[in-house]
């Protein structure tokens, strides 16, 4: 089970109280493998990592090599910044499926995130 702790889209309904409750329940439950974090805000992702520790995974949407705002209110941060802030797995959508060569772009995301992981550890 992955719990939604943060969202990167503008205007989302998650409050700090919600986030704290999710983290409190998720860190004490062995059935929870990890949390969904905010890839658009590395500082928030780093705070999530501090709160959940190294025993839980953080999966991170909201990353794109083209940092900025999306068409439907989503915000994107750079995948390397997300990994350096504590993300264990980046979730990439439009950055790959809208590319002219999706396979090549997937390799690029893989390399960028792998390089960041090597820098982090």
Indicate residue ranges for each PLM-predicted region.
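Electropositive phosphate-/nucleotide-binding environments in soluble metabolic enzymes
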Residues: 16, 20, 42, 76, ...
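Glycine-rich beta-strand-to-loop/alpha-helix junction loops that act as flexible
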Residues: 60-63, 92-95
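A short pocket-lining beta-strand/turn micro-motif at the edge of beta-sheets
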Residues: 54-56, 86-92
């Amino acid at each position: 089970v992955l719990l939604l702790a943060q969202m990167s889209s503008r205007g989302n309904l998650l409050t700090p109280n919600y986030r704290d409750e999710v983290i409190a329940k998720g860190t004490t439950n062995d059935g929870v493998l990890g949390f969904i974090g905010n890839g658009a805000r590395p500082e928030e992702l780093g705070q999530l990592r501090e709160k959940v520790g190294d025993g839980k995974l953080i999966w991170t949407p909201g990353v794109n090599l083209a940092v900025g705002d999306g068409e439907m209110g989503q915000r994107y941060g750079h995948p390397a910044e997300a990994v350096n802030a504590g993300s264990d797995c980046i979730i990439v959508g439009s950055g790959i499926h809208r590319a002219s060569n999706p396979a090549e772009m997937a390799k690029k995301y893989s390399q960028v995130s792998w390089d960041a992981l090597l820098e982090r550890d």
